[in-house]
């Protein structure tokens, strides 16, 4: 575990096509070489100079404070997207905009903030939706894990993109899917399938009983759902 380390100097080594990084570990400067350095410093809400202070709209740590329907502390003033709480994602902001427009028109609309998909457009891609294992453990929710590697996927092997896996987390009692995490080819598309399933309250068994085209990388989602109940076909299952 090398989290929370103070970063020092960073050098790009042209001849080796690598990056040399200095960081502090237990009070000592350590220098190591890596293939790549990903800079992920986060973002801040750009809420300054867009609100008339005389309106007295509540601001919390730079974010415009809103309720679950994006209503601010002032009646008839709404805020959406990156200036309000939650992940700074275009699709989340877009859905909030639709919800607000619907509610202004006196129609009922909601955003399910428990099912906001996230994607890292790296290579391989990383995508997830729902809960992760740490969150489930913190909430003391008993869950099952189904995991399927792309190394066992015929389509992934055929296109030479077999690195990664699909992980399905489902409730131990109800089998309801609680989270899906994908690292590998077409991760963003696979997670979208998972998101639709979760919106309708699908169980791992529901996905297991669904026919998937072969060969496709999305079969990995099918196999991971099967694996959640020790019924995987193309990999070994856990000993009961």
Predicted feature residues:
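Single conserved hydrophobic/aromatic residue that forms the stacking wall/gate
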Residues: 1-11
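FAD-site-proximal beta/loop scaffold in flavoenzymes
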Residues: 31-104, 110, 189, 197
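Short, structured loop/turn "capping" segments at alpha-beta junctions
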Residues: 107-113, 142-145
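Flexible, glycine-rich terminal cap/loop adjacent to redox cofactors
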Residues: 122-132, 137-240
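Flexible, acidic loop-helix segments that line cofactor/substrate-binding pockets
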Residues: 13, 109-125
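A short, glycine/Asx- and small/polar-enriched loop/turn
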Residues: 14-19, 74, 159-164
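Short beta-strand and adjoining strand-loop segment in the mid-core
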Residues: 24, 83-89, 119-126
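Conserved beta-strand-loop-beta-strand element in the redox core of flavoprotein oxidoreductases
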Residues: 15-31
């Amino acid at each position: 575990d090398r989290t929370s380390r103070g970063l020092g100097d960073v050098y790009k080594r042209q001849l080796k096509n690598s990056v040399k990084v200095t960081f502090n570990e237990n009070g000592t400067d350590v220098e190591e070489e890596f293939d790549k350095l990903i800079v992920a410093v986060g973002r801040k809400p750009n809420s300054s100079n867009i609100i008339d202070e005389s309106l007295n709209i509540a601001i919390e740590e730079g974010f415009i404070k809103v309720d679950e329907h994006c209503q601010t502390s002032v009646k008839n003033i709404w805020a959406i997207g990156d200036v309000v709480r939650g992940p700074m994602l275009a699709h989340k902001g877009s859905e909030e905009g639709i919800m607000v427009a619907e509610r202004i028109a006196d129609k009922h609309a909601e955003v399910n903030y428990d099912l906001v998909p996230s994607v890292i457009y790296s290579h391989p891609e990383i995508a997830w939706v729902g809960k992760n294992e740490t969150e489930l453990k913190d909430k003391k929710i008993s869950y099952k894990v189904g995991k399927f590697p792309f190394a066992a996927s015929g389509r992934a092997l055929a296109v030479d993109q077999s690195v990664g896996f699909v992980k399905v987390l489902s409730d131990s009692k109800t089998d309801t899917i609680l989270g899906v995490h994908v690292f590998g080819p077409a991760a963003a598309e696979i997670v979208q399938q998972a998101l639709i399933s979760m919106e309708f309250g699908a169980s791992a068994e529901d996905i297991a009983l669904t026919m998937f085209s072969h060969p496709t990388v999305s079969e990995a989602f099918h196999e991971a759902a099967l694996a959640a109940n020790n019924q995987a076909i193309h990999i070994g299952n856990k000993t009961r």
